Amino acid sequence: MFITPGPNNAMLTISGLKFGFKRSLPHISGIAFGHAIQVSLICLGLGFILIDYPGLQIVLRWLCFGYLLYLAYQMVGSIKDYKKESGRPLKVYEAALFQWVNPKAWTIAITVASGFMPLEEKLWIAVLFTGLMSSLVSFPCISMWALFGSLIKTMISNQFIKKFIEYLFAILLVLTGFYLVLN
């Protein structure tokens, strides 16, 4: 699930495109770190809060949808001059915090916790192991999206391709938001 399209991977593609792979590493690390913490807390029982209070899940979906709309709006026209980098990639803590309003991250975390956490082990060891493994698996998967973005950076000199990429990713973010809210 880490490698499939979603909010994190769309943002990483644009980060790789705008800032290159190396400068996107804090963003990648923040996602992996934030997700490991999220998985660990769900393994400790936080997932039951979402089950007991389904309204909270709806609130998370709408927060994520709003953020994705904001990102889509920011994305159009954001690739002004690929040689002059404006702005900055997300910092580790910003990417880690985004996981808490990302419904796909919640879905993955609950799936990982329910499907892969060894129940016969000591709880703390199992939680640490599950969180660590989640982070180790996610890192190369999400890194591929930033790498993809940095590779297509060379095509941005063509104005048509530049606009196409901007609008494509903006539309994909909006569609992802609609999918998250409607499901």
Q: Where do the language-model regions lie?
A:
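Residue-level signature of transmembrane alpha-helical cores of multipass secondary-active transporters
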Residues: 31, 95-99, 131-138
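Structural signature of hydrophobic alpha-helical transmembrane segments
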Residues: 1-5, 61-63, 132-140
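Juxtamembrane transmembrane-helix termini in multi-pass membrane transport proteins
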Residues: 1-58, 108-130
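Membrane helix-loop-helix hairpins that form the core translocation module of multi-pass transporters
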Residues: 23-91, 148-151
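Hydrophobic alpha-helical transmembrane segments in multi-pass integral membrane proteins
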Residues: 41-44, 101-113, 171-183
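Selective transmembrane alpha-helices of multi-pass membrane proteins
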Residues: 51-80, 138-141, 145, 153-183
